[in-house]
Each structure stands twice: as C-alpha cells, then as structure tokens.
A protein has these predicted regions:
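Generic recognition of stable, solvent-exposed alpha-helical segments in well-folded globular domains
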Residues: 13-16, 25, 29, 76, ...
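Transmembrane helical segments that form the transport core of multi-pass membrane transport proteins
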Residues: 3, 120-199
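Alpha-helical transmembrane segments of multipass membrane proteins
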Residues: 55-56, 82-87, 138, 142, ...
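Alpha-helical transmembrane segments
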Residues: 71-86
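A cytosolic-side transmembrane-helix exit/cap motif
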Residues: 92-101, 172-173, 250-257
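Structural signal for alpha-helical transmembrane segments and their membrane-water exit/capping regions
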Residues: 91, 107-110, 139-150, 253-254
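C-terminal transmembrane helix pair
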Residues: 12-13, 25-72, 188-257
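Juxtamembrane inter-helical linkers in multi-pass membrane proteins
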Residues: 1-24, 96-119, 165-170
Length: 257
C-alpha cells in the first residue's frame, strides 16, 4: 500500500497489476474493483504502458537471459523506473485524490473444492465470451491491412525511426507492427533476429517493444472500459514515449556499455 501510494493508488491496485503479468486484457477488466475513476484510469494506463503479459515476458527473459544477467537487470530497472515515473506523473496530472485502503479481513478458511471448480469454470466461460472474440477481430484486421498493403507501408515508414533513433536493423520495424496484434509476436520477431543483434540492440529492442502499445485485444478492452477518446489519448502518449525511452537507452548504453 505504501509503494502504490507513490503513484496515487492504494494496495487494492496490486491485483490488476499482478494479473497484468498474465494477460493485460483480463487485468484491464479487473480495474473495476478499484473505487474511483481516477484510480482505474491510472491503473489502465500503467497496464498498457509498462506491464508485460506472460507470453511477452517469457520471450523477453528468454532472449535477454541468454545474453547476460546485466541485460536482464537493465531491462528490469527500466520497466520499474518507467512504471514508477509514469505513475507518479499521472497521479499529479489527473485530478482527484487518492482513496485510502480500507478493507475487511475475513477469517481464514480452507477452500471448498466444489466452489473453486464452479468459480473457475465461470471465469473461464466469461473469458472465452469476452476476450477471445477480441483476439479474432484483431487477427482479421491485421490480415485485411496486410492484404490491402497498409502494413508494408507502415513498416516502411517506420524504418528510419527504428534504424536511426533506436539503432536497430530495419527489419525490426515489422516486429513493432506485429506487436500490435499480440505483444508476444513483437518480442518473438526480435527474438528471431537474435543472431543479427548485439547486446545493446537486444536490450533496446526489448525495452521499446515492452513499452509499446498493448495488443489489439487490450486496446479494444481499454475502449470498452475507459471510452474511445481516453484509449486513443493513451495510445498517442505511449507510442512516442516508448520510442523516446528506447532511443534514450540506445544513447546511454552506447556511452557506458
């Protein structure tokens, strides 16, 4: 609770944050448990910006872990630093006050197996109905954009930024586009290029792809929960911020590593 107070939240926000390490789409929905619109807005923003889902996290740690512990440490410190800085700034800029954590502590009891199975089945059914269609819509949209020639145009337009500012090969621009479909696709695209990347490029690429906009399903869930204007405003903030941080680490790491 004291840690989350630094970013304008209370200890209740730990639940969506931890769930975000599994699936950001699901975690966005769980922000409903927070008491105020301000807390829900800050939490959704931080989930979209700096919380990697389990699939992306596995790829990131697999790639950087094969390089060195230093690479993993730099990435971890970057994510924690961005999370705390962005949360602190958001808590100062978004009007409202922090609501203190007040919760009841029920007596500890052994779970009843039947209740656990029933509730798990209910949550699974809800997930399949609410979330899976969003992934299907995202897949179809990316397929249509590819066939219409929009994706190649976006990839080509992003090459100067990827090569000049981030210091990555031009092929890496495709990974960022695929990361919009699913976060782990972007990280996997960089992982497939591991042999062509030096340690600095690998760290910079993974920092940028982690901070990049969430997957299409998460974006649709953000629209559903926070509204179209708020979701688009978050995207407008997150995309340049991710590239700014990535380029900054590119300059810093070349200077000291």
């Amino acid at each position: 609770n004291r840690l989350f107070a630094l970013i304008g939240l209370n200890g209740r926000a730990v639940l969506p944050m931890v769930l975000g390490l599994g699936c950001v789409t699901m975690a966005t929905l769980t922000t409903r448990i927070l008491h105020s619109p301000r807390e829900r807005l800050i939490t959704v923003f931080l989930l979209a910006l700096a919380i990697p889902c389990s699939a992306q996290l596995g790829v990131v740690l697999g790639m950087l872990g094969s390089l060195s512990f230093t690479a993993v440490l730099i990435w971890t410190l970057a994510m924690v630093g961005v999370l705390m800085l962005a949360g602190f700034l958001a808590s100062k800029l978004i009007p409202g006050r922090r609501i203190p954590l007040v919760t009841e502590l029920p007596p500890m009891r052994l779970p009843i197996a039947g209740n656990v199975v029933k509730k798990t089945a209910g949550r699974l059914k809800w997930y399949l109905i609410e979330v899976i269609p969003l992934f299907l819509i995202g897949t179809f949209l990316m397929f249509a954009l590819d066939k219409l020639g929009v994706l190649p145009a976006i990839i080509e337009a992003g090459e100067p930024l990827v090569t000049g500012w981030l210091g990555l090969p031009k092929e890496a621009s495709a990974a960022f586009v695929m990361g919009f479909l699913r976060r782990d696709f972007g990280a996997t695209g960089l992982f497939a290029m591991a042999d062509a990347l030096n340690p600095i490029q690998a760290v910079v690429g993974m920092i940028t792809i982690t901070l990049f906009i969430p997957c299409f399903a998460s974006l649709l869930m953000m629209v559903k929960e926070r509204g179209m204007k708020t979701a688009l405003a978050m995207v407008v903030i997150i995309v340049p911020f991710a590239f700014f941080v990535g380029g900054l680490f590119n300059l810093l790491l070349h200077a000291v590593w």
